[in-house]
Amino acid sequence: MGIYSFWIFDRHCNCIFDREWTLASNSASGTINSKQNEEDAKLLYGMIFSLRSITQKLSKGSVKNDIRSISTGKYRVHTYCTASGLWFVLLSDFKQQSYTQVLQYIYSHIYVKYVSNNLLSPYDFAENENEMRGQGTRKITNRNFISVLESFLAPMVNQ
């Protein structure tokens, strides 16, 4: 299996979209925006945030030191951070080298078209002060975004 899950975090640490695939043989299996994934989202964002903070402290001067992927024995986490503070995260098997360009494409061609340019979609997913720091409950539910994202990622799920 190539891709296990896909996550989008906003600038307030909230998981605003998550998709998890459970069966390699069926790219339609799994969950979208599931309540069960909330704890996993917090752990994943916490790990990325902590490693990013460490790399910024270790980098000298004005040299930009971004995290693009994190590897473990069985998994690889691919990340892409936008200028507006959105984090696009893809969890894949260890064999996949880089999904940075895939994440950039998802942001620039799918997210911008179906979420950012949609006047009915919220600009900021944290409605008030209480929904910051990972406490937000609003998710991306745009059917067009979900279907285009599904069709784009489906071939990579079964790699």
Swiss-Prot record:
Keywords associated with the record: Autophagy, Endoplasmic reticulum, ER-Golgi transport, Golgi apparatus, Transport
Out of the domains of life, which is the source? Eukaryota
Name the Gene Ontology biological process terms: endoplasmic reticulum to Golgi vesicle-mediated transport; intra-Golgi vesicle-mediated transport; macroautophagy; retrograde transport, endosome to Golgi
Q: Is Endoplasmic reticulum one of the keywords?
A: yes
Q: Which SUPFAM superfamilies match?
A: SNARE-like (SSF64356)
GO cellular component, alphabetical, reads: cytosol; endoplasmic reticulum; phagophore assembly site; TRAPP complex; TRAPPI protein complex; TRAPPII protein complex; TRAPPIII protein complex
Q: A Pfam family matched by this chain, by name?
A: Sybindin
Q: Which Gene3D superfamilies match?
A: 3.30.450.70
Function text: Component of the TRAPP I, TRAPP II and TRAPP III complexes which act as guanine nucleotide exchange factors (GEF) for YPT1. TRAPP I plays a key role in the late stages of endoplasmic reticulum to Golgi traffic. TRAPP II plays a role in intra-Golgi transport. TRAPP III plays a role in autophagosome formation. Required for sporulation. Has a role late in meiosis following DNA replication.
Its quaternary structure?
Part of the multisubunit TRAPP (transport protein particle) I complex composed of BET3, BET5, TRS20, TRS23, TRS31 and TRS33. Part of the multisubunit TRAPP (transport protein particle) II complex composed of BET3, BET5, TRS20, TRS23, TRS31, TRS33, TRS65, TRS85, TRS120 and TRS130. Part of the multisubunit TRAPP (transport protein particle) III complex composed of BET3, BET5, TRS20, TRS23, TRS31, TRS33 and TRS85.
This protein is called Trafficking protein particle complex subunit BET5
Record lineage = Eukaryota, Fungi, Dikarya, Ascomycota, Saccharomycotina
